[in-house]
Amino acid sequence: MAVTKEDVIDFIAGMSVLELSELIGEFEEKFGVSAAAPVAVAAAGVAAEAVEEKTEFDVILASAGSEKIKVIKEVRAITGLGLKEAKSLVESAPAALKEGVSKDEAAELKAKLEAVGATAEVK
């Protein structure tokens, strides 16, 4: 009667940890292999990071343009700041309005600012 794979698996399942360790050592010697996990090349990790897409963006008010009052109103709506704080923010341009927002939200905020005459950037 031939030994099946299931017989081998059942036999191995009944072994202690010490016996399994010795068995693995014997396999490594007999077949010239190693049971260690393969190590990834460091350069491959660098390439993977370069492909990773940015997920958080900052909306920067570059300048208020000629319609400063409209821009202040829009900045208040976007940030929830009071009138005085929004005015100071607009006058101190370039300044960050929102940080760590999604790509879609950043594009939407930029479009709103440009619609009232401001110059905005997404970084």
Swiss-Prot record:
- Specify the signal sequence span: none
Q: Which InterPro entries match?
A: Ribosomal_bL12, Ribosomal_bL12_C, Ribosomal_bL12_C/ClpS-like, Ribosomal_bL12_oligo, Ribosomal_bL12_oligo_N_sf
**Entry-linked Pfam families:** Ribosomal_L12, Ribosomal_L12_N
Q: Which domain of life is it from?
A: Bacteria
Molecular-function GO terms, alphabetical: mRNA binding; structural constituent of ribosome
Q: Name one GO cellular component term.
A: cytosolic large ribosomal subunit
Q: Which GO terms describe its biological process?
A: translation
Which keywords does UniProt give here?
Ribonucleoprotein, Ribosomal protein
User: What does the protein in this record do?
Assistant: Forms part of the ribosomal stalk which helps the ribosome interact with GTP-bound translation factors. Is thus essential for accurate translation.
Assembly and binders: Homodimer. Part of the ribosomal stalk of the 50S ribosomal subunit. Forms a multimeric L10(L12)X complex, where L10 forms an elongated spine to which 2 to 4 L12 dimers bind in a sequential fashion. Binds GTP-bound translation factors.
| HAMAP family the record matches | Ribosomal_bL12
In terms of NCBIfam families, this protein maps to:
L12
Family to which the UniProt record says this protein belongs: Belongs to the bacterial ribosomal protein bL12 family.
What this protein is called in its record is Large ribosomal subunit protein bL12
| Gene coding for it | rplL
